[in-house]
Amino acid sequence: MSRVAKAPVAIPAGVEVKLNGQEITIKGAKGELSRVFHKGVVIAQEDNQLTFGPREGVANAWAQAGTARALVKNMVVGVTEGFTKKLVLKGVGYRAAMKGNAVGLTLGFSHPVEHELPEGIKAECPSQTEIVLTGCDKQLVGQVAADIRSYRAPEPYKGKGIRYADENVRSKEAKKK
C-alpha cells in the first residue's frame, strides 16, 4: 500500500487551485498547469492543502492516489519555482545557438539540426556548448531535453555527444589487437 498519498500537498501563497471533478488546475507566478486524474482518486481541498485518497471499490486506487499526489506536488513546484534541465555538448565542432523559438545544433551531420521548442519551454545558450531549458511542466522540460539529447547521445569511447550536465558517461576501453 502506498504511503505517498497520505501526506497532504501544501498550497503556498500566490498559488490558485481549482478543482472540477477529476480535473485540477493550478495557477502561479510561472504559469498555469491542468491535469485530469484517474476516477479512483478522491481529491479534496482543505484550507491551504490538498489531500488525496482512494475511492472505494477501485483496484489499485492507493497507487493511483500516490501518483496523483506526486504529480500535483510537481505542478505546485513548477508554477512557483519552475524546472530546469541543462545539456552539455562535447565534441569537436559541436555547437548550439538560439534561432528564434528553436535551438540550432551543429552536431557533425551534413546538415544543421533545428529543434523547435514547444509552448511553455524557454531555452538559452550561455555558451556554444551549453543549453539550459526551463519551464513549469516537469514532464515537458524532461521530454524536450531527451529529444535534444537523442540527436547525438554520448558515445562510450570518446564521450562525444549531447549529455545532461549531471550525467556520468562510462567510457569503454578501445579494442586491443
Curated annotation (Swiss-Prot):
It comes from Vibrio cholerae serotype O1 (strain ATCC 39541 / Classical Ogawa 395 / O395). GO terms for cellular component: cytosolic large ribosomal subunit. HAMAP family: Ribosomal_uL6_B (MF_01365_B). It holds the Pfam family Ribosomal_L6. GO terms for biological process: cytoplasmic translation. Belongs to the universal ribosomal protein uL6 family. This protein binds to the 23S rRNA, and is important in its secondary structure. It is located near the subunit interface in the base of the L7/L12 stalk, and near the tRNA binding site of the peptidyltransferase center. This is Large ribosomal subunit protein uL6. The lineage of its organism: Bacteria, Pseudomonadati, Pseudomonadota, Gammaproteobacteria, Vibrionales. Keywords: Ribonucleoprotein, Ribosomal protein, RNA-binding, rRNA-binding. InterPro entries: Ribosomal_uL6-like, Ribosomal_uL6-like_a/b-dom_sf, Ribosomal_uL6_a/b-dom, Ribosomal_uL6_bac-type, Ribosomal_uL6_CS.
